[in-house]
A protein has these predicted regions:
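A broad structural signal for alpha-helix termini and local helix breaks/kinks
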Residues: 19, 38-39, 53-55, 173, ...
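Membrane-anchoring hydrophobic helices of lipid-metabolizing enzymes
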Residues: 1-119, 124, 167-168
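Short, contiguous strand/loop micro-motifs
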Residues: 33-34, 92, 152-153, 218-221, ...
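Catalytic core of membrane glycerolipid acyltransferases/transacylases, capturing the structured
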Residues: 111-182, 210-220
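Non-catalytic C-terminal accessory region of glycerolipid acyltransferases
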Residues: 134, 167, 171, 182-302
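Residues that cap or flank secondary-structure elements
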Residues: 38, 96-97, 157, 224, ...
Length: 302
């Protein structure tokens, strides 16, 4: 039954993905308005997060950021549906994402055993599976093959939704016959077993610690005392990975710039806490640059 349900939902998404992106944005705007105005979806959470993160910002300015955030949330949904049936050529032709510094990535990746990339919920994280299909600002290709990418995710409670989201995020890779998603509980075993193979492990790292995960205080982030998980940097330190921060800036509707910022060459030479502190400093800088670009509905500070 699960397989049938997954195939039905995936079939609908792939069919919808063939429609123009402009149509999806139109529907996304309706979704955003309903989420913000009609259903007030986590509106209190958004406003509390914003007011505590920007204590000097006036209430009207906070409301404006919230409005822009919900519009962005609608765009994320629209782009995720459009992405679900897109191959590399379609992603490239659309220009939806541009990698700004492929040379920096290539130099670090090719000179180290493997790499850990610490991603965020800025921009549109649902588009990460198309990394190899995106344009670069210099024309230099990213020195990476399909089977070298691993994106870490937390398994959803609903098995159908979990499988749909997993396949949707890796649609472009699925089209060429591979996949990239690995559940967080299995990543250490996989990385150790494949330590002799150069790979990139992409970790979304800015969530509140999972229920069963150890909580580590990191100090202030966005003016609030923050607990973090150290699993991503722990893996990097244990296996001597290089580490990069993935910045995803929303330039305008339908245009993102992806920049990979080097954090260290050999994580085993750094403390896990220092790496994580550096990550949150970079994230705070990114959020301050474009406040509406982050996922404010997330209960980051519980």
């Amino acid at each position: 039954m699960k397989k049938i349900a997954v195939n039905i939902v995936r079939g609908i998404l792939v069919a919808l993905s063939k429609l123009p992106l402009k149509f999806h944005y139109f529907m996304g705007d309706i979704f955003a308005w309903m989420a913000r105005v009609v259903f007030r979806y986590r509106y209190d959470v958004v406003m509390i997060n914003l007011s505590r993160s920007f204590p000097d910002m006036k209430y009207k300015a906070l409301q404006a950021v919230a409005k822009d955030f919900y519009r962005h949330l609608g765009e994320i949904a629209a782009e995720a549906i459009w992405f679900s049936g897109s191959d590399y050529k379609r992603l490239y032709d659309s220009g939806i994402v541009t990698v700004t510094n492929p040379e920096d990535f290539n130099e670090l990746f090719l000179s180290t055993p493997s790499m850990t990339v610490l991603s965020t919920h800025c921009g549109n994280w649902e588009l990460l599976g198309g990394f190899l299909g995106y344009r670069t600002s210099t024309g230099v290709k990213v020195a990476l093959e399909e089977d070298q990418i691993r994106v870490v995710y937390k398994q959803l409670t609903n098995p159908v939704a979990d499988e749909v989201f997993k396949r949707n995020r890796a649609s472009a890779l699925e089209i060429v016959g591979t996949s990239c998603e690995i559940e967080s509980m299995n990543i250490l075993r996989h990385a150790v077993a494949n330590r002799d193979k150069r790979k990139v492990y992409i970790f979304p790292t800015d969530q509140h610690p999972y229920t069963k995960a150890a909580k580590h205080p990191i100090g202030e982030f966005m003016h609030q005392q923050t607990n973090v998980m150290l699993g991503s940097v722990g893996l990097a330190c244990r296996l001597s990975h290089s580490v990069m921060y993935l910045k995803m800036k929303r330039v305008e509707r339908g245009r993102y710039e992806m920049t990979l910022i080097p954090m260290c060459v050999n994580a085993s030479e750094m403390k896990q806490e220092d790496l994580m502190r550096k990550y949150y400093d970079l994230l705070q800088e990114e959020i301050n640059e474009t406040p509406a670009n982050w996922l404010w509905t997330h209960k980051r500070w519980k």
